[in-house]
């Protein structure tokens, strides 16, 4: 009888230790937020932009840029920048430069690209609404520079779960 009690107490102690090692559903649950954005003016339109945020990764998809008029056909270089205005401060989320070194032109339309990493560390998600902008700076073959800014409409796609 003493052996059975010792075995049962040992088994109970082992089970108690291993219960703390299991992954609870609360620990496995990750917060996921998905935002879409778009915008347009008389020169160009941006569609299909997406921001994906979870506890392990932040990804910013710039979407597609479509030129609405063919006024920007002699572009030799451009800079595309997404940023959030926070007060008077411009917080850049993604920016890149393209320049043709052969004397030809580059096309501004098409896929804008994506970036992953700590994109949103400087801003809060509440700052995205009404504060996300796209800036296009171009230089044509004659060296003339132009700058265009577009405020983007941000929509949260995910809904917060009530627990």
What are these regions (language model features)?
Residues 62-64, 131-135, 149-151:
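Beta-strand secondary-structure signal
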Residues 10-11:
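Classical Sec-dependent N-terminal signal peptides that target proteins to the secretory pathway
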């Amino acid at each position: 009888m003493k052996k059975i009690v010792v075995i049962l107490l040992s088994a109970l102690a082992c089970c108690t230790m291993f219960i703390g090692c299991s992954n609870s559903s609360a620990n496995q649950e990750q917060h996921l937020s998905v935002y879409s954005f778009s915008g347009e003016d008389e020169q160009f339109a941006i569609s299909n932009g997406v921001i994906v945020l979870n506890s392990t990764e932040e990804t910013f998809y710039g979407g597609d840029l479509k030129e609405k008029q063919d006024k920007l056909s002699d572009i030799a270089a451009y800079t595309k920048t997404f940023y959030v205005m926070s007060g008077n401060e411009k917080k850049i989320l993604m920016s890149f430069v393209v320049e043709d070194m052969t004397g030809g032109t580059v096309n501004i339309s098409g896929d804008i690209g994506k970036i992953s990493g700590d994109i949103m560390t400087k801003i809060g998600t509440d700052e995205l609404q009404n504060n996300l902008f796209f800036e296009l700076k171009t230089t044509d073959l004659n060296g003339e520079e132009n700058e265009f800014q577009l405020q983007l409409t941000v929509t949260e796609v995910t809904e917060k779960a009530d627990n």
